[in-house]
């Protein structure tokens, strides 16, 4: 059962909007269309429509988020793998995600949507707003157990690991002993990632040249999950400076001021709502395999000459290009904290997304599944 990361599965939307931000934007659609990932929606001008549709609006009273008026977003294909194999339904290579891993399983005799399934979710939100997802996830694991006659192997990537940990922490040990055989964690950001501060301050176009970082920033800020991924104090020193400007330094003790200074105070509320969700870092209570990339330059801190609207100078440290090594190594602490085995495997030179299709990863999964 595959659990994707942030941005890691398709989202669909249907519109019936009172107003639009640009005359080129659709106001009403008869059916659902692909909101993520559809490269055509990210072109100049059209991207304004996309941002207005995919953003979330934070409600300070209910502490939850809602879509803009007249936008209905759904997650296609729960229980299936298509929406995480290719993020772009046209199967363009740019959106290839879980495909290589799933196809390898199929080559070994597994069947898509039968004994290999996907658990996509609305990755814009944190687990506190995705309660129905966890109910469905539990039911699906039980169903897979019944249909296939044995416990399930979970494979999660990136933020999907935070979701998986949250889920496992809420199941009884008896349930986990019965239904979960192994848990493979790929590129898990257990302690948050330094890159998040840049995403919130000035945006990050993920190296997609047609997109301006400042444009996409509003969408990235509005996703609760971005704020959930800020570095945590159980991983990083309290005095580490993540962001510096000519007039201020920001450590993880300065988030409230950081949000005020970037003029996004809702973010501080979102962070407070989500910080406790896996803060205890309770071990998962199942046999675990932590695979993590090293040896790739990973953003570690940022210097802004003009804060926050200009791109920063980036300082790097070790990791997989996204997840800093110290965040990935949380797994080590669990080795002596649970009776089930915790195995760590360093993937040297493995980038955050590429590790999913890396030969080492795939052969590790194969050995695990076939007890080789």
Predicted segment positions?
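Glycine-rich, aromatic-lined ligand/substrate-binding cores of catalytic
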Residues: 222-306
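A short acidic-Thr-Gly-centered motif at the start of a beta-strand
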Residues: 109-111, 146, 281, 302, ...
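N-terminal non-catalytic accessory region
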Residues: 1-155, 159-220, 239, 244, ...
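Short, surface-exposed loop/helix-turn segments at secondary-structure junctions
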Residues: 301-317
């Amino acid at each position: 059962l595959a659990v994707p990361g942030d941005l890691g599965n398709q989202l669909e939307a249907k519109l019936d909007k009172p107003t639009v931000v640009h005359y080129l934007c659709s106001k009403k659609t008869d059916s659902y269309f692909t909101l993520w990932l559809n490269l055509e929606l990210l072109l100049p001008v059209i991207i304004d429509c996309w941002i207005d549709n995919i953003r979330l609006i934070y409600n300070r009273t209910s502490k939850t988020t809602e879509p803009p008026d007249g936008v209905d977003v759904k997650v296609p294909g729960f229980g299936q793998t298509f929406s995480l194999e290719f993020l772009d339904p046209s199967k363009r290579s740019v959106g290839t995600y879980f495909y290589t891993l799933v196809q390898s399983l199929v080559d070994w005799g597994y069947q898509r949507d039968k004994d290999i399934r996907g658990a996509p979710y609305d990755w814009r939100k944190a687990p506190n707003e995705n309660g129905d997802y966890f109910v469905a996830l539990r039911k699906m694991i039980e169903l897979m157990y019944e249909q296939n006659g044995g416990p399930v192997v979970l494979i999660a990537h990136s933020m999907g690991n935070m979701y998986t940990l949250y889920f496992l922490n809420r199941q009884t040990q008896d349930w986990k002993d019965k239904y979960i055989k192994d848990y493979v964690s790929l590129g898990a950001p257990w302690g948050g990632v330094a890159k998040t501060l840049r995403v919130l301050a000035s945006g990050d176009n993920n190296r997609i040249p047609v997109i301006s970082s400042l444009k996409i920033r509003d969408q990235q800020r509005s996703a609760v999950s971005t704020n959930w991924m800020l570095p945590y104090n159980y991983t990083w020193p309290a005095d580490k400076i993540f962001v510096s400007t000519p007039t201020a330094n920001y450590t993880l003790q300065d988030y409230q001021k950081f949000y005020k200074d970037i003029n996004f105070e809702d973010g501080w509320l979102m962070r407070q709502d989500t910080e406790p969700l896996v803060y205890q870092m309770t071990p998962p209570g199942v046999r675990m395999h932590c695979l993590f990339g090293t040896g790739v330059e990973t953003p570690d801190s940022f210097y802004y000459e003009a804060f926050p609207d200009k791109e920063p100078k980036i300082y790097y440290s070790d990791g997989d290009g996204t997840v800093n090594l110290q965040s990935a190594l949380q797994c080590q602490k669990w080795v002596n904290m649970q009776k089930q085995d915790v195995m760590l495997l360093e993937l040297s030179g493995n980038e955050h997304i590429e590790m999913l299709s890396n030969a080492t990863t795939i052969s590790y999964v194969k050995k695990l599944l076939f007890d080789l």
